[in-house]
Amino acid sequence: MEVENRPNTYDFSKRDKLLSNRFYEENSLQDETDDGGERWCLICGDRASGLHYGIISCEGCKGFFKRSICNKRIYRCNRDKNCQMSRKQRNRCQYCRLQKCLQMGMNRKAIREDGMPGGRNKMIGPVHISLEEIERLMSGQEFKEGSDLSDSWSHGYSNHSSPGNSLSEGGQSLSFSSSRSVSCRDECISPQLTHTFLMCKYPLPPPTGSILKTQTHTLTGQILADEDLTPLTTPMLIEDGYSVTQSELLALLCGIADELLFRQIVWLKRLPFFTDLSIKDCTRLLGSSWHQLILLSSITVHSAQILGELANVTHHYTPSSHTLQRFGEDAMEVMESLNFLFRKFHQLNISNEEYSCLKTITLLNQETTGLCNTSMLKQLSERYWTLCRELTERLHPQRPKRFSDIITCLTEIRHTSGKMMSIPLEQLPLLFKAVLYSCTTNQNPWLPKSSTSRT
């Protein structure tokens, strides 16, 4: 596409001036304050919220460091591994951000082993680690050795509560990060979903109840038959040379969302357990999960159309300078999350059967108040979790961690879709243009670089 000849079509670094906040010196670990008594993050210069993992830092860098270590993420720098860190630039290079965290003394041993909020030991201070150890962490070598050790425990707990967001397949690494705070993620991941997610690493108890006795292959066939896997009918074709306006692209995005939502309603009514649930329960479940279902559909069965036809339409949209300036940090984080999800699901290559199971799991695992038949919903939830795991193990016996990778993606979908709901409508055209441009060109930082890298 023509867009590939414009390497910096979206140079977000130009939309903000550099911060004027006073940064700490690279080797200073003291709790310094300015005349007003405020403290600044050692990593990015944002206002610090306290002592986190041994050093003074902000909530964003605290959460980023925790996710990077707990999820064993591996990043790449497209430049010289010396990118500037500031509050508004910290999201642009996760490699340099994590490297700065380690250089400034953030202590990974202060992270709780269960991965939950709260330091493991408030008295643990900053640490100094060698350049060799930093390189081992940044390259993922230390994570790999730790993973090999934990794999030798047949049923033992690993050092982290959730599978990593780094996926290695065919010698290529995929990673994800954003600067959202831990508290934001805690709000988006319900206790019910977190509990079930943790349970998925270990054998679930066998399902009970007459409604759960359907054979696995029969049940899989039933929910697959309920799916409408045909291409989207919303027109996404455009003539060459036509300039798409912001309102036109927004109308198209709304049209696609409307069609996907309608398909979810039809799908729900076809599910084998639909008649066993009250209309009230079905309405509440769909009302709390529709945005997750739409996102899941977009990045799996409809990804070819989204990355093809829709990406071509967004290519003909040119945002104004005003729109670029108003593209906030929340939108940047969503963009990063969507990039990750598109890439990871592409590598996972989810089958239609797995997709059907994941949709059902997403529908049933909602922390919704006012449900009538909670006991049946719990049984159904356990049944479809087990079904999905059995299906994944049968289709991919050589990849025992595949199910955990998939469930990690569901958690990310839950968070990202919720975050998208807070993005102003007028920012959505630019958001999708940036995401689809990144996913369809080698601008994506997770794509392997063959010879040269763009800056």
From Swiss-Prot:
Instruction: Give the annotated DNA-binding region, as residue ranges.
Output: 38-113
Where in the sequence does UniProt note compositional bias of the Polar residues kind? Answer: 149-165
Iron-sulfur keyword on record: no
Which parts of the sequence are annotated with region: Disordered?
Answer: 145-173
Query: Mostly located where?
Result: nucleus
Q: Name one Pfam family in it.
A: Hormone_recep
Instruction: Establish whether keyword Aminoacyl-tRNA synthetase is in the entry.
Output: no
Q: Which PROSITE patterns match?
A: NR_LBD (PS51843), NUCLEAR_REC_DBD_1 (PS00031), NUCLEAR_REC_DBD_2 (PS51030)
Citing just one GO molecular function, the answer is: hormone binding
Domain NR LBD, residue spans: 215-446
Instruction: Give the SUPFAM superfamilies listed for this entry.
Output: Glucocorticoid receptor-like (DNA-binding domain), Nuclear receptor ligand-binding domain
Entry keywords, A to Z: DNA-binding, Metal-binding, Nucleus, Receptor, Transcription, Transcription regulation, Zinc, Zinc-finger
**Which InterPro entries does the record associate with it?**
NHR-like_dom_sf (IPR035500), Nucl_hrmn_rcpt_lig-bd (IPR000536), Nuclear_hormone_rcpt_NR3 (IPR050200), Nuclear_hrmn_rcpt (IPR001723), Znf_hrmn_rcpt (IPR001628), Znf_NHR/GATA (IPR013088)
Q: Where in the cell is it found?
A: Nucleus
An example GO CC term for this entry is: chromatin
- Domain of life of the organism in this record? Eukaryota
* ZnF (NR C4-type) residues: 41-61, 77-96
List GO BP terms, alphabetically.
animal organ development; anterior/posterior pattern specification; cell migration; midbrain-hindbrain boundary development; neurogenesis; regulation of transcription by RNA polymerase II; response to lipid
Q: How does it assemble?
A: Homodimer.
Q: In UniProt terms, what function does this protein have?
A: Probable orphan nuclear receptor. Binds to a response element containing repeats of the motif 5'-AGGTCA-3'.
Family to which the UniProt record says this protein belongs: Belongs to the nuclear hormone receptor family. NR6 subfamily.
The protein's name = Nuclear receptor subfamily 6 group A member 1-B
